[in-house]
Amino acid sequence: MPYSSIDDLPASVRTHLPPHAQEIYVGAFNGAWQEYAWEGPEEREKSAHRVAWAAVKRKYVKMGDSWIARGD
């Protein structure tokens, strides 16, 4: 299911990502959810999460336990 806000994200995402990265995650997840409407429910969910993590990783890098904004 698409997320209405960052407050709706799973705790595993909310507690690890900074707020801006959470916004990226929500936007990418929701966009992918629409894009992959033809997939079955479980595969659609997995695909949307993969896209969301990829979007976050384009703007942030994980250093230790923290996600740091990329300088580029």
Where are these predicted regions, by residue range?
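C-terminal alpha-helical interaction appendages
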Residues: 1-72
